[in-house]
Amino acid sequence: VRRQRQMCIRDRYYAEKVRKQNYALDEEMLRPYFSLENVRGGIFFLANRLYGITFRPIVVPLYNPECEAYEVLDADETHLGVLYFDFFPRQGKGGGAWCGYFREQRYRDGEREAPVVGIVANFTRPTATAPALLSLDETETLFHEFGHALHFLFHDVKYRGLSEVEGDFVELPSQIMENWATEPQVLAEYAVHYRTKEVIPEQLVRKIRNSALFNQGFATTELVAAALSDMDIHSIRRYEPFNPEAFEDNALRLQRGLIPQIEPRY
């Protein structure tokens, strides 16, 4: 009896093999051009070019010695805020990447109280022979979270309770910054091979752009499923204790036919 084996589309190992086969491109081919130091320099370059702001390393108390801190200066060199980076994993630290604030912007006694913002990630640490090298996805993630950081840093409201925005706007600044990450003019400024100092070749840039929609069918379905699950949960009319996993499985798989290879995102 011939059996067919289903492959989970989420398996990044095999997804990379397919991408390499279809586009002559894989993650490891790109990593040498995306050292963490260069990518950080790239987001600083872009922010300066777009908004005129600059970033100056400062010595301040850190909650972990691996963190970094920068003073953010406006085009006229006035103080906008402080930006912390916490790049590497450690025991007890949450996974993934996010941006948040330690202090929101507000006015106190007529004086602007600047925000203190943090970007947190879990990138691979540098080794004895190489700096921390990011994947293209991690590079776009850092640009994305930096967009959130800029949103916090640019706040200028009298009352911090009025600094929030509508939920459907929250991701706009981050999406804008994320899309800059692979623009050829921006790549030319920061995507430099950590050993040869060669700027990323145009041929590789074309491959990045040609493969930009690779595996997006899965990604889109995953996000739509998450949105549907969220709406289902918030449509419950009788508020009684329930099993979220069983509820989600029933809503997505039994009622909507979500294939098992796409697991619930959250």
Question: PLM features: what roles do these ranges have?
Answer:
Residues Y63-N64, E71-E140, G257-R265:
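Active-site-adjacent "gating/activation" loops or surface patches in catalytic cores
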Residues V1-I9:
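Single conserved hydrophobic/aromatic residue that forms the stacking wall/gate
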Residues R125, L133-L153, S174:
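Active-site recognition of the HExxH zinc-binding catalytic motif
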Residues L73, H79-V82, H155-M231:
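Acidic/histidine-rich catalytic neighborhood
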Residues R10-S35, W180:
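Short His/Asp/Glu-rich catalytic/ion-coordination signatures at enzyme active sites or charged loops
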Residues T54-C67:
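Long, charged, glycine-rich C-terminal linkers/tails
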Residues S35-T54:
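Zn2+-dependent metallopeptidase catalytic core
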Residues L30, L36, V205-Y266:
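Pan-zinc metallopeptidase signature
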